[in-house]
């Protein structure tokens, strides 16, 4: 079974269910039904943010939002070979966990 991977934008969010609707501008602004986000963390992407979505190829609308890819508009706040960083807020650096291989930083 082949999957269909698309790039779209979050059009609305059901915060209680952890699901979102995604709009595909290249498909005449077609909007999905509510689909889940692939995550066991609760951090919903902002409405209007770009996301990758996998749809099953069985002819249904079944799919899952994989997450937000890095892009020219959504760049990593910092980088490094052994860096782990998890931003907890919508604005990078406001609240985060950071580990660079030797130092653990927790900012809140």
Show which residues each predicted segment covers:
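Exposed beta-strand/loop interface patches that mediate assembly or binding
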Residues: 1-100
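Extracellular beta-strand solenoids
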Residues: 99, 106-108
